[in-house]
Swiss-Prot record:
Source organism of this protein record: Saccharomyces cerevisiae (strain ATCC 204508 / S288c)
Note: Completely overlaps TEL14L-XC, a telomeric X element core sequence on the left arm of chromosome XIV.
Annotated Basic residues bias: 35-45
Region (Disordered): 1-52
Highest taxon in the source lineage: Eukaryota
Full protein name: Putative uncharacterized protein YNL338W
Length: 52
């Protein structure tokens, strides 16, 4: 129990930031826009800045 609180402010914070990293989120987001070329084309064309 003594080791837990001691590593909480340092180890836990680092681990907490490492776990919820945007790495897993990006992976899930990447496959979504991938099959959707429409979104990609729209972003590239950017003919309507209001839509963005």
């Amino acid at each position: 129990m003594s080791l837990r609180p001691c590593l909480t402010p340092s180890s836990m914070q680092y681990s907490d930031i490492y776990i919820p990293t945007p790495t897993p989120t990006h992976h899930t987001h990447t496959p979504t826009p991938h099959p959707h070329p429409h979104t990609h084309t729209h972003t590239h064309h950017n003919p309507n800045p209001t839509l963005f």
